[in-house]
UniProtKB/Swiss-Prot annotation:
This is Uncharacterized protein YhcE. The gene is yhcE. It comes from the Bacteria. Keywords: Cell membrane, Membrane, Transmembrane, Transmembrane helix. The keyword Lyase does not apply. It is found in: Cell membrane. The chain crosses the membrane at residues 17-37, 46-66, 93-113, 139-159, 172-192, 222-242. It is a multi-pass membrane protein. The keyword Transmembrane applies. GO terms for cellular component: plasma membrane. It comes from Bacillus subtilis (strain 168).
Length: 253
């Protein structure tokens, strides 16, 4: 555990400057939304910028994981590290997901404020209970980012494991991408879809706009299965183990 904490502190220290860049970028985008909304007298512009920021936030963790992997690959210090590949990858995932979790909490608070602001201005078609929506969307965001981050780890590890096949490894990566998409389309997606009737929950994450003298926002429900979350986590963990075993072969990057 002490070695893991040491790796975690190293990864956090390595990328904290880029975290500030992300935070400044998010503040700039949200601030731009407020300026445009104020000048156009259309408060719903703020909602549009909020949705855009929330979408791009899903890619924060994968981007930071890739950044850590590139730094690790250039230094090659991991080749002499007594920790296994699982600890090395886990520390990078933990640091990246920690960043994302903190920013998600801040964005959630902003979203709740925005919802009440639109409610006070009578710009909502109808009131909805967003309590479960807030919790489930935060879970979905973290799990989705974890899945993409582990995908980055798998592809990075496989790519560098083919160092002796430089003329073929890009072709091999294209084949891997095709297999990955096939696996997701015909195995994972049908599996998750088949479980949608187990533990269904309502999430208000769809929306539409209506014009009645002023533009109003309508939040629409969709139904998700809570069972899909543990399925995604188990598959992601198995992929992480596979990448870790491959890294433990001490592939030179």
């Amino acid at each position: 555990m002490n070695s893991f904490l040491g790796l975690l502190k190293k990864d956090i220290k390595l990328s904290r400057m880029w975290l500030l860049v992300w935070i400044c970028g998010i503040i700039f985008l949200l601030g731009t939304g407020h300026i445009i909304a104020s000048r156009t007298k259309e408060p719903l512009v703020i909602f549009g910028f909020f949705v855009a920021v929330a979408f791009f936030l899903l890619f924060l963790s994968p981007v930071f994981v890739f950044y850590h992997l590139r730094k690790e690959g250039k230094s090659q210090l991991w080749l002499y590290n007594p920790n296994g590949g699982l600890w090395l990858f886990s520390s990078k995932l933990a640091a990246s997901l920690l960043y994302q979790f903190v920013i998600q909490l801040a964005l959630t608070a902003y979203g709740i404020w925005m919802y009440h602001m639109l409610s006070v201005k009578n710009l909502l078609e109808h009131q909805v209970d967003i309590t479960s929506t807030v919790a489930l969307l935060n879970m979905y965001g973290l799990i989705s980012s974890l899945d993409m981050s582990v995908t980055v780890i798998v592809f990075w590890t496989v790519f560098h494991s083919l160092r002796n096949w430089r003329g073929m490894r890009w072709a091999a990566m294209v084949l891997l991408v095709a297999m990955w998409l096939f696996f997701d389309e015909y195995i994972i997606s049908p599996l998750v879809e088949s479980q949608k009737h187990f533990w269904p929950v309502t999430v208000y994450c769809n929306f539409d706009f209506h014009f009645h003298n002023v533009w109003r926002l309508e939040l629409k429900p969709i139904h998700l299965s809570v069972l899909g979350f543990p399925i995604a986590i188990v598959i992601t963990f198995l992929l992480l183990i596979m990448a870790s075993k491959l890294l433990d072969r001490k592939v030179e990057v």
